């Protein structure tokens, strides 16, 4: 059991994170799983945490260390957001999960992946935990809130995510025209659209229509939960004209605190 989160377990009347015991251990207990060989651990990797959990699960299965993995992405950003900070407007709560298991099929599975962490030039401070924007609150309270340097995050994402996506897709040996959907972390609609435009520009091909499902307008930015919840919406039904068929080649891509990127 892999639980990816940043602020996944916070009571409704506090913004203090409860990490002892781990959230994954709590999930295992609630599911009443008796087998001690079912290992449970948390990942804190910023918004890319759930995708990183999927990558790790794939490695466990491929190596023979596991046959089935539950990967959960969950966050409660509403409880660590500063209501006086305009960056807090799109923060949301959410959770999503998948189960990966081994099989002998050659027509399904994870074809390739790519992960990176940038810290050398101060990228680790682009998103951080800080005091409220309101002086009266910050002066009289020790509470911290999620904060970010929005412009730096935006520029970092546009400069680095398209190349990371290309590295991942090139490793799959697939043709770019066969890519059916891109599920990208729902951080900012304008930023996501710009990332995808730059990604296709790297291949010198026009961006296909209907390649990029988006749900940030309805669900907001729920951090690690955005990709699994969006994937679920599209997989279950014809969501805003987006649907999936067996055998479709899709891509997950995310960027977030760290700064971390994966695809």
Mark where each language-model region is.
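Short beta-strand segments
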Residues: 3-4, 44, 69-75, 100, ...
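Condensing-enzyme catalytic core mediating Claisen C-C bond formation in acyl metabolism
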Residues: 84-159, 163, 255, 263
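Glycine-rich beta-alpha junction loops
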Residues: 7, 75-76, 103-104, 114-121, ...
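Claisen-condensing/thiolase-fold acyl-transfer catalytic domains that form or cleave C-C bonds
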Residues: 10-17, 21, 43-62, 158, ...
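Solvent-exposed alpha-helices and their adjacent loops that cap or buttress functional pockets
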Residues: 33-35, 61-64, 88-92, 103, ...
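Short glycine-rich phosphate-binding loop at a beta-alpha junction
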Residues: 1-4, 175-185
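Flexible, glycine-rich active-site loops centered on histidine and acidic residues
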Residues: 62-95
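Acidic-glycine-rich active-site phosphate/pyrophosphate-binding loop
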Residues: 18-34, 71-76, 135-137, 192-208
């Amino acid at each position: 059991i892999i639980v990816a989160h940043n602020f996944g377990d916070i009571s409704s009347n506090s913004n203090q994170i409860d990490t002892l015991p781990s959230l994954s251990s709590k999930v295992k207990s609630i599911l009443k799983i008796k087998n001690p060989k079912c290992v449970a651990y948390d990942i804190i990797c910023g918004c890319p945490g759930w995708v990183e959990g999927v990558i790790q699960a794939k490695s466990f299965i491929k190596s023979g260390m596991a046959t089935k993995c539950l990967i959960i992405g969950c966050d409660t950003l509403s409880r660590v957001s500063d209501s006086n900070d305009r960056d807090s407007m799109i923060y949301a709560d959410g959770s999503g999960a998948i189960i990966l298991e081994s099989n002998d099929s050659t027509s399904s599975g994870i074809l390739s992946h790519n992960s990176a962490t940038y810290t050398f030039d101060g990228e680790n401070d682009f998103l951080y935990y800080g005091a409220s924007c309101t002086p009266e609150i910050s002066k009289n309270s020790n509470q911290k809130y999620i904060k970010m340097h929005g412009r730096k995050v935006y520029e970092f994402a546009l400069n680095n995510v398209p190349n990371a996506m290309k590295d991942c897709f090139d490793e799959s040996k697939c043709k770019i025209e066969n890519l059916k959907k891109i599920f990208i972390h729902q951080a900012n609609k304008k930023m996501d659209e710009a990332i995808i435009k730059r990604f296709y520009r790297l291949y010198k091909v026009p961006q296909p229509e209907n390649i990029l499902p988006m749900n940030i307008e309805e669900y907001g930015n729920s951090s690690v939960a955005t990709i699994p919840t969006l994937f679920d919406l599209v997989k279950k039904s014809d969501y805003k004209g987006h649907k999936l068929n067996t055998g479709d080649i899709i891509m997950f891509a995310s960027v977030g605190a760290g700064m971390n990127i994966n695809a």
